[in-house]
UniProtKB/Swiss-Prot annotation:
It catalyses: adenosine(2503) in 23S rRNA + 2 reduced [2Fe-2S]-[ferredoxin] + 2 S-adenosyl-L-methionine = 2-methyladenosine(2503) in 23S rRNA + 5'-deoxyadenosine + L-methionine + 2 oxidized [2Fe-2S]-[ferredoxin] + S-adenosyl-L-homocysteine; adenosine(37) in tRNA + 2 reduced [2Fe-2S]-[ferredoxin] + 2 S-adenosyl-L-methionine = 2-methyladenosine(37) in tRNA + 5'-deoxyadenosine + L-methionine + 2 oxidized [2Fe-2S]-[ferredoxin] + S-adenosyl-L-homocysteine. The lineage of its organism: Bacteria, Bacillati, Bacillota, Clostridia, Eubacteriales. GO terms for biological process: rRNA base methylation; tRNA methylation. It comes from Clostridium tetani (strain Massachusetts / E88). Reaction proceeds by a ping-pong mechanism involving intermediate methylation of a conserved cysteine residue. PROSITE patterns: RADICAL_SAM. The gene is rlmN. This is Probable dual-specificity RNA methyltransferase RlmN. S-adenosyl-L-methionine binds at G160, E161, S192, S215, L216, H217, N291.
């Protein structure tokens, strides 16, 4: 298998080229991928594909759709959390959230994470490896198979930093957006980053209409550096400049994620400072009650303080929402289930 290629890493054009190089008709490429997107991962089960082609496919490709290690469904059935295992034994998490407007999946782009944000369980233990775009796609396909429902929205907010896995993240976006793929509109895809400034500027040149979400979590450098190592590399000023560049290039509104930690970044003065920082920007602030992590000592802000923080931003003309908690009874916050599983089971490869 080590010399074989994950078929999910091939675009339609890639597979067409392979068919031609192997003396087969290029239309067979679409037929094969149609089966894959219908959830058929066994080449021999692709009924309209001749045996001679399925034999060649089996000799050259494998389909890396992860297996389900654990599956948790919240009491209200609005959230389904998966622990997926890849062929090399590595574990990642994906979460499906069901809304009235459709089903959203939160995908992981790396096994673990090296960014070191102190309120995130994904980064405990560091990074193991990045996922290929086909492996990220496999999360969506497997989730659809398990839930029996179509995924209509994607958020790249699971474990890992998407911009630290730049090429695979972009290839994944283009594959799920393709008409011959899942045909999910770019405006239904959100990429979240801790703020790698050069990559934000690079992303601005890609001619994409996705939503960019920035994990900001502080109105100034002093506070941000206490929780996010990336803040020692790029200042808040540099980050905001890159965001304005992105907005001007794409004409797309940016979302700023702000996890509220009691007595760290949740006071009125912090809200006022944040309002000043974001004044005039085409942006939206998503306030997040911080999740409890076993290994960390952070405490979420009180409901009253969160509402007060939100009101200050709203009165300053900043579009603001408070994230609805989903799946808290199944530890659906990023990285928590994987961390617990890895801790209690055999070492990852």
């Amino acid at each position: 298998m080590f010399n074989m290629i994950n078929l999910l890493d091939l675009s339609l054009e890639d597979l067409k080229k392979w068919m031609i190089e192997n003396k087969e008709k290029e239309f067979r490429a679409k037929q094969v991928l149609d089966w894959v997107y219908k959830g058929v991962y066994n080449f021999e089960a692709m009924k309209n594909i001749p045996k001679v082609i399925t034999n060649k496919l089996q000799e050259n490709f494998y389909l890396s759709v992860p297996s389900v290690v654990q599956k948790y469904v919240s009491k209200d059935e609005s959230t389904v959390k998966f622990l997926f295992k890849y062929n090399d034994g590595n574990i990642i998490e994906s979460v499906v959230m069901k809304y009235k407007h459709g089903n959203t999946i939160c995908v992981s782009t790396q096994v673990g994470c090296k960014m070191g944000c102190t309120f995130c369980a994904s980064t405990i233990g560091g990074i193991v490896r990045s996922l290929s775009h086909g492996e990220i796609l496999g999360q969506v396909l497997k989730a659809q198979e398990e839930t029996g429902e179509r995924i209509s929205n994607i958020v790249m907010m699971g474990s890992g930093e998407p911009l630290d896995n730049y090429d695979n993240s972009l290839n994944f976006i283009r594959m799920v957006n393709a008409e011959n793929g899942l045909n999910i509109g770019q405006r239904h895809i959100t990429l979240s980053t801790c703020g790698i400034v050069p990559k934000i500027r690079q992303l601005a040149e890609e001619n994409l209409q996705i939503t960019l979400a920035i994990s900001l979590h502080a109105p100034n450098d002093n506070i941000r550096r206490k929780t996010m190592p990336i803040a020692s590399v790029y200042s808040v000023e540099e980050l905001i400049e890159a965001c304005n560049y992105y907005i001007n290039k794409t004409n797309r509104r940016i979302t700023f994620e702000y996890a509220l930690v009691s007595n760290l970044n949740d006071k009125e003065v912090h809200a006022e400072e944040l309002a000043t920082l974001l004044k005039g920007m085409l942006c939206h602030v998503n306030l997040i009650p911080v999740n409890k992590i076993d290994e960390k000592d952070f405490k979420s802000s009180s409901t009253n303080r969160i509402k007060n923080f939100s009101n200050i931003l709203l009165k300053s003309g900043i579009q603001t929402t408070i994230r609805r908690e989903m799946g808290s009874d199944i530890n659906a916050a990023c990285g928590q289930l994987r961390r617990r599983y890895v801790k209690n089971n055999s070492k990852e490869v």
